[in-house]
Amino acid sequence: TVVGDWLADASAADVFEHPGARDVVRREQFQAQGAASTREVLERIPGVSAPLNNGTGSHDLALNFGIRGLNPRLASRSTVLMDGIPVPFAPYGQPQLSLAPVSIGNMDAVDVVRGGGAVRYGPQNVGGIVNFVTRAIPEDFATKLDVHSELSPSSSQDGLKTTHNVLIGGTGANGLGGALLYSGTRGGDWREHSDTRIDDLILKGRFQPSDEHAFSAMTQYYDGEADMPGGLGTAAYRDDPYQSTRPYDKFWGRRTLASASYEYTPNASQKLNVTGFFTKTLRSGYLDQGRNLTLSPREYWVRGLETRFSQGFELGESRHEVGIGHRYVNEASHELRYWTRADSGQL
């Protein structure tokens, strides 16, 4: 049977047959480990370094990781996908994840591919591929809810930091299924001025009228904002390690995604995949830069279409697979910057 999409849904069979370095952490595992964020899941994967979001300009909406020793800052050296769709707001022009619209509560698995297999996807393939697999549509109607809370009693945190995750959906006898996913976070970390609000809503649909044809679609609306406590000098840390000396720093962003795909499998030796997607992203924030306070709103629009055809054949006693395809991506952005004197007291 041809593979076609090497990433697919990161099933155990896909991972076992993958000819290269590949690790998958599934939902049961990261729930059992008590992982509260994407960073905590990635940090447990061999060859991946995922440092904390700390220092000036850091917040929970960003993601930092590096594979096999590469610079982890904003994960700019790796291709980051969600169900095969690029996560960065400009995957070719600005691949940094200063806004990473991925909530671990909406994921079934985190799939990390290292080595030569990354070449097939790109564009930042030198640092491997990380594909976040969203929660699958249940075969039978189901409603699932879980809540995760964090408390730092010895810090300046005011109350709990809580995340709610919800899944509602199912599949009918005619092969038509859908699911609504939601993950929301409220609260602050152990530092002052670290309040975070995240709302991540995903709607998935799939229709498989026969074994040969399968249609799927997904929409996402992600909206979040976070106060940024910033770094501390040695003297300030000794005085109070929980304080924040940057009361104006704040980041916010939102993203809308729409994607649709078609899979045609006429027989065990052929497979055709067609995927189209559109994303619109806003990222902005206030940053204290000494004498000035800056506001930098940036909007991005990305449109993409990708096709893949795979053909399997036998040569002697060995079986081979040849794939051909194309990718078209169009990116556009609108970036502004405003500033005011820091001593004006106005934003």
Which sequence ranges carry the predicted segments?
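Extracytoplasmic beta-strand/coil segments of soluble accessory domains associated
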Residues: 39, 43-86
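Non-catalytic regulatory/gating segments with a bias toward low-complexity or hydrophobic composition
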Residues: 30, 42, 110-111, 130-132
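Short acidic/polar hinge/loop motifs at secondary-structure boundaries
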Residues: 85-114
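Transmembrane beta-barrel wall of Gram-negative outer-membrane proteins
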Residues: 156-186, 190-228, 250-267, 316
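Short strand-turn segments of transmembrane beta-barrel domains in outer membranes
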Residues: 117, 134-169, 189-190
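N-terminal periplasmic "start-of-domain" segments of outer-membrane beta-barrel proteins
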Residues: 3-33, 59-64
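Extracellular loop and loop/strand-boundary signature of outer-membrane beta-barrel proteins
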Residues: 150-154, 186-191, 197-202, 241-248, ...
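Face-selective signature of the C-terminal outer-membrane beta-barrel domain
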Residues: 208-222, 251-347
